[in-house]
Structure formats: C-alpha cells, structure tokens
C-alpha cells in the first residue's frame, strides 16, 4: 500500500507534507534544489520541470506547482470536489513577480484553501465561498510580492490574475507549464 493511501483526511495530508516535503525543485538532471539563497537557484527557470504527485513523493521536494500535483492526486483518490488555481501577475517583460498555485476544496458547504508551499500561510483555511478564498490568496500573494520582489509596485495589483487549470502533462518545463495553466479557465468573477 502506498503511503498516500494511508492518509485519511486533508489534515493528515498536511501533516504528512509538513513532515516529508521540502520547498524546492528538481532539475531535469535529477538534482534537488532546496536553498533559495544559493546561486544555483537562479537557474530554476532553465533547469526545473514540473513533477507529478508520485515524483514529489519520491523526491520529497517541490515548488507549489509540484506540491499541488501531490495534493491533486490525494484529493482525487478521496473523492473530494476541488479546484487547482494558478495566480500570477500578467505584466509584460521580464520581472521577478511571484506566481503561486494552490488547491481549494469543498466540504459541507464550505471552501478550504489547502496550503503547504506558501510557508507563512501553511495550513487549511476556511471560507464561505470559492471567490472569497481566491481573493484572500491573491491579497496575500500581492503582499508577499511587495515585500519580496524588487520590481513590485502598487499598480501591479490590477495585473494579478487567477486561472483554474486541469492536471498538466508530466515533465513540462517552466514555459510549457505556464502555457498550460494560463490556458485554463480565467476567473472573471467581479470579486477577483
């Protein structure tokens, strides 16, 4: 029996991830990158590929993009209603503005943001609606960008977009992944 099959609740999944999964990425060469302050981290765009859930379990390392695929696998196996969301700043030209992926699931009429990769918000957060959850994450992402991005400006908030996206193909590089997630359903809700 796979370890993932022994996990019986979202809370247990979060605890498992807390105990076993580290933020970072795996390069196409199989090398694990976990030190964001290392000069090697600067190469992520060229060397990173998006892992599927099984690969994250094996490597024990993943970006939010990867970790959501592990979460997706568990939520599918356990018959939850959920969506995966990608948010990013749609600005032209090179920039250091962050993107984020996350999972929202529905249970007993409530919506829950399941978060492991966004360190300061690690946990399961309850909301009354899907749009409320997405807006909350967007607000936190914007605050994070203002604190951590050299290029972030207040007017960038207007360019922070959310996309619901389906499971990506295996072994996508960064550009392929970005094309996949931004081809998803653009969330045009007036509250977003």
Regions found by a protein language model. Give the residues of each.
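A structural boundary/capping signal
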Residues: 1-192
């Amino acid at each position: 029996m796979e370890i993932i099959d022994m996990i019986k609740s979202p809370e247990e999944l979060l605890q498992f991830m807390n105990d076993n999964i580290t933020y970072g990425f795996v390069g196409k060469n199989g090398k694990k990158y976990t030190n964001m302050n290392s000069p090697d981290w600067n190469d992520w765009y060229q060397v990173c590929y998006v892992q599927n859930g099984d690969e994250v379990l094996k490597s024990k390392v993943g970006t939010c993009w990867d970790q959501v695929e592990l979460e997706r696998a568990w939520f599918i196996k356990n018959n939850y209603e959920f969506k995966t969301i990608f948010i990013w700043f749609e600005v032209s030209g090179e920039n250091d503005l962050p993107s984020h992926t996350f999972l929202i699931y529905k249970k007993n009429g409530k919506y829950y943001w399941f978060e492991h990769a966004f360190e300061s918000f690690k946990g399961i957060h309850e909301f009354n609606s899907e749009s409320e959850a997405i807006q909350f994450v967007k607000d936190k992402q914007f605050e994070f960008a203002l604190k951590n991005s050299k290029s972030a400006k207040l007017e960038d908030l207007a360019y922070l977009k959310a996309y619901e996206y389906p499971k990506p193909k295996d072994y996508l590089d960064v550009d392929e992944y970005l094309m996949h997630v931004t081809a998803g359903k653009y969330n045009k809700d007036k509250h977003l």
